[in-house]
Amino acid sequence: MKLIISSLSALLFSGVILSAQMPGMVTMQQASASQGTSLGANTTSGAAGIALGNRVVMRGFVDFQFKYDDEDSNLTPGSGSQTEAFNTKADIDFLFDFSPITGEVHIALGKDDIELEQAFARYSLNRDFNFSFGRQLTALGYESDEQPGLQSVSNAYWLADRLAGNAQIGTAPKGPTQTRRNYKDGVRANFNNGKFGVSFGLHDGYWKNDNFNGDNIAIDIAASLMIVPGLEARLGYAQEQYDDQSGSSDNISQLNGWIAYQPGDLTLAFEFDNMDILSDEYWSMMFHANYQFVNWMSATFRYSHEDYEAMSVSNEADRLSFALLFSLTENFGLNFEYSTTSVDRLNVGDYDEFYVEGLLTF
């Protein structure tokens, strides 16, 4: 409770002392209330970026981060570990508009590998209805999958992805379970008329697997309503049946809902998640607040709670984050974040993180 009060006080105090505009600073356009939902929409046509001819647009970002973390152990009081690291990654997207056919290719570049994030095409039957097929971003979840859309440096949730990889039935699944938004192959039917959007997808895996072997198949459906300009509510459900090599079968399912309000400079959001991960159970909630004090500076306060029950053992995490985001030019931002996570597990205690990020967008 003291931590929550002190964090709220810090947010208010920072807003007071930093709300005066810095002279000579290059400014950006302030946020305005969103007029429509993006779920199911054709967001390729008319997208901003660097024009490479009449029908191709390129956009992307370079993300450079310094991270310091301090992890305490619950096993031995006073013990733990501290690490510091630099990390650089980049992302390049190519958008093609041959209306009524549009398409996108997203490439992620890290220091060790190059990954195809998304590669899909879309056929628009009319202004409101379209089909998309290929490797696409999954629909469930409030947080952006890429740094420029986060309004922070880190993600809200700490516990789920670290434990979900241990969920197993019969033969242990290979690799971790990505419980947040990721990229999967499949087909989607989409509808969007501005005020209301819906998307229904069929995939060869949503969290695990990448084939239709056995009964491995996944579906997801999400619907979004722009109640009034700036106030959006979204609800989605996804399920994947998982069959391992031993013949055992179980499901992974997720119910996700969020509501966001953005009247102008203020953004408020609340998200709730409930998942059955094979034989494990997981639920989480997140509150997100961002305020644009001036054109070149905003602040974000975020709180999340997670409860992960594996083999009747409950693991909980409470995470508080505070970020200051500075737009030095239209294309370059300098961001700072402090996050502290209280973890109720046998071998992990408090976990503190500090980030400095330079973010170039184009």
Write out the residue ranges for each language-model feature.
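N-terminal periplasmic/intermembrane-space "pro-region" immediately following the signal or transit peptide
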Residues: 5-8, 13-63, 362
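Detector for outer-membrane/organellar transmembrane beta-barrel domains
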Residues: 195, 224-311, 318
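Outer-membrane beta-barrel proteins
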Residues: 41-51, 96-100, 125-129, 193-195, ...
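Outer-membrane beta-barrel "beta-signal"
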Residues: 326, 332, 350-362
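Transmembrane beta-strands of outer-membrane beta-barrel pores
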Residues: 64-70, 89-91, 98-100, 107-111, ...
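Solvent-exposed loop/turn segments connecting transmembrane beta-strands
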Residues: 52, 84, 107-116, 179-184, ...
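Outer membrane beta-barrel
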Residues: 44-69, 80-205, 215-217, 224-232, ...
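Flexible, surface-exposed loop regions and adjacent strand-edge segments
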Residues: 75-80, 148-154, 317-319, 353-354
